[in-house]
Amino acid sequence: MIFNHHQSVMLNESIGALNIKTDGIYIDATFGRGGHAQGILNKLGEQGKLIAFDQDINAIEYAHKNFTDSRLTLIYSAFSNMLNIITQQGLMSKIDGILMDLGVSSPQLDNAQRGFSFKADGPLDMRMNQTTGMSATQWLNLANEEEIANVIYQFGDEKRSRHIATRIKKYQQKHTLETTLALAGIVSKVVKRQKNKHPATRTFQAIRIFINQELKQLEDVLEQSKDILRKDGRLSIISFHSIEDRIVKHFIQKNSRQKNLPKGLPIIDYKIEKTCLKNLGKYFASKAEISRNKRARSAILRVASKN
């Protein structure tokens, strides 16, 4: 098996959080270039199984070329379809753990043709699955100024969102906005450069999240996980920005918080509504990892188990 240059963030911590059983069945919801998947396979015995999802055909093609392990099943699909696929495979409530790495992989960022990067010029696409949906260029040309501003503010926490949207529409009066560097240039005229952060970071993040409906897909798969996991099954989720982390945090808290106790004494056990999850905490990358891989500095790992 051949790895490319992509470094999986918090590899040992996220896999350790799964508490892997050698004969267990696990899901890697975001295969990418297979770093976490290989880590899971390394801990599984001959009877163990790993099901890996990815909606990027490049990731699936890479997996077919570089992974020959018979314990691995590849699914070309967004992870929001997990419940349907696991049901079809007869594995409902039989999964021992689900791992999600919510970051964009280095090959996606580094390939200018994908449209994720503001560092190299390419078509303004940003779709994880380039065979479906609307590209960033198409959306920016169809959306009005208010819609663009709202997306950049809501999904990017960008305070200058309205000024950016105004500049985008002004640019489009004379030009077609269709390249990454054109968009980055527009944003850079509005947002001041911060230390270690490109002015267009939040805008690109926001448009990517919106185009791919990433937060809706995350909310969907989190709810599905409650039915997919077996008792004591683990959730191990790495997020890279505050919006995703808030969704994961609130999901775990909501489902691990003890409900109000019934009135009256004595309190009978069967009348106490059981919590669905147990919150097993949050973790950050080590200083050593951050020094090797700057992407790790914003990573937050949250872990939970099913009651």
Curated annotation (Swiss-Prot):
It catalyses: cytidine(1402) in 16S rRNA + S-adenosyl-L-methionine = N(4)-methylcytidine(1402) in 16S rRNA + S-adenosyl-L-homocysteine + H(+). It is an enzyme of class 2 (transferase). GO terms for biological process: rRNA base methylation. It is found in: Cytoplasm. One of its GO terms (molecular function) is rRNA (cytosine-N4-)-methyltransferase activity. The keyword Cell inner membrane does not apply. Its main location: cytoplasm. PANTHER family: 12S RRNA N4-METHYLCYTIDINE METHYLTRANSFERASE (PTHR11265:SF0), S-ADENOSYL-METHYLTRANSFERASE MRAW (PTHR11265). This is Ribosomal RNA small subunit methyltransferase H. The lineage of its organism: Bacteria, Pseudomonadati, Pseudomonadota, Gammaproteobacteria, Candidatus Pseudothioglobaceae. The gene is rsmH.
